[in-house]
């Protein structure tokens, strides 16, 4: 590390300590609650997708869901001559609740990288933003791919962070399997084929188009009072996208494709807006309102310390947060997996 870089690093560590009211950021400390809220806001705002869902702080490690979305109709009329008026609970009655699990977001930056950044006047913001952005990406990856919360995670065996926490899709599989379609005429396969509607022997296709699939699951797997709710969207795997729905994606330069956090379809899919979100699994789609998906983080539970490791020629940032991924109301969404497009469906 060059001497001028060291000055920048020392100022960065001093600023982190000052903001959190601790004498030294190189010793483990609890992030100040106000700073934690500001950091979580930065993480959310760094992602177009996370900005559209709920990211809220909770006081308890586990408890009842906050029920942040609409949970059903309340309008009624009562003949008070015969009975009393009755109120309706606006919150979700869900015995599952939530449980926050400690998640480590440990990173490092090599001396060479820091030396290259030292010439920029916004050095501290650059260091902060690269950490914030990766935490946002990791939360999306866990939300769509997480299936367990292992005591010791294995990033080699689980490259999509499947063992870090239990994500939204896995909760549908385990807590609301009736709203999950994983097969059609053939077990383990939902086949899209233009001949699906033909009354001919040997036809194995389940739906003629993705539009037909989406329309059907909205009317068969989602609770009736949510089916026409404004804000229902279709999140689908990248391999199911086509120029019909996303004609502009392939026209973007590679750098913009990489930076695109959330791509919205120009045409509707089964009557709903389609969305391509990073790390959503291939061969799958999810219908939901975005405010039905949440990330809870525990207030006062974020821990951090920053240290230099000259043995590895780098600066290390150790950070942890207690997080939970929550589906507010399973009735407001559904999941379809194992979707296959036939050659006819792909080639039109």
Which positions does each model-derived feature cover?
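Compositionally biased, intrinsically disordered low-complexity segments
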Residues: 56-61, 69-73, 77, 112, ...
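Long, contiguous amphipathic alpha-helices that act as assembly "spine/axial" helices in icosahedral shell
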Residues: 66, 91-179, 224-238, 274, ...
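Sequence/fold signature of self-assembling virion shell proteins
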Residues: 2-14, 19-23, 27-47, 163-216, ...
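Charged linear interaction tracts used for macromolecular binding and regulation
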Residues: 219-220
């Amino acid at each position: 590390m060059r001497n001028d870089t060291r000055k920048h690093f020392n100022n960065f560590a001093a600023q982190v300590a000052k903001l959190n009211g601790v004498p030294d950021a190189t010793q483990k400390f609890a992030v100040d609650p106000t700073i934690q809220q500001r950091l979580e806001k930065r993480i959310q705002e760094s992602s177009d997708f996370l900005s559209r869902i709920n990211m809220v702080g909770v006081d308890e490690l586990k408890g009842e869901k906050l029920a942040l979305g609409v949970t059903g109709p309340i309008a009624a009329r009562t003949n008070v001559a015969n009975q009393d008026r009755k109120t309706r609970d606006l919150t979700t009655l869900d015995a599952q609740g939530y449980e926050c699990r400690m998640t480590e977001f440990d990173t490092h930056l090599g001396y060479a990288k820091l030396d290259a950044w030292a010439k920029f006047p916004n050095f501290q913001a650059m260091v902060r933003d690269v950490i914030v952005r990766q935490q946002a990406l990791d939360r999306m990856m866990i939300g769509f791919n997480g299936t367990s919360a292992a005591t010791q995670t294995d990033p080699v065996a689980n490259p999509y962070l499947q063992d870090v926490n239990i994500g939204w899709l896995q909760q549908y599989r385990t807590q609301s399997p009736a709203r999950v379609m994983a097969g059609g005429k053939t077990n383990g396969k939902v086949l899209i084929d233009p001949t699906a509607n033909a009354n001919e022997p040997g036809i194995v296709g389940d739906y003629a188009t993705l539009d037909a699939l989406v329309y059907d699951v909205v009317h068969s797997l989602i609770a009736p009072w949510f089916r026409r709710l404004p804000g229902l969207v279709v999140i689908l795997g990248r391999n199911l996208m086509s120029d019909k729905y996303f004609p502009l994606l392939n026209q973007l330069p590679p750098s913009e494709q990489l930076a695109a956090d959330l791509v919205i379809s120009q045409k509707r899919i089964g009557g709903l807006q389609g969305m391509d979100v990073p790390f959503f699994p291939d061969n799958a789609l999810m219908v939901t309102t975005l405010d039905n998906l949440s990330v809870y983080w525990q207030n006062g539970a974020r821990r951090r310390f920053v240290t230099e490791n000259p043995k590895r020629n780098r600066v290390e940032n150790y950070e942890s947060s207690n997080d939970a991924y929550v589906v507010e109301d399973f009735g407001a969404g559904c999941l379809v997996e194992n979707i296959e497009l036939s050659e006819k469906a792909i080639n039109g």
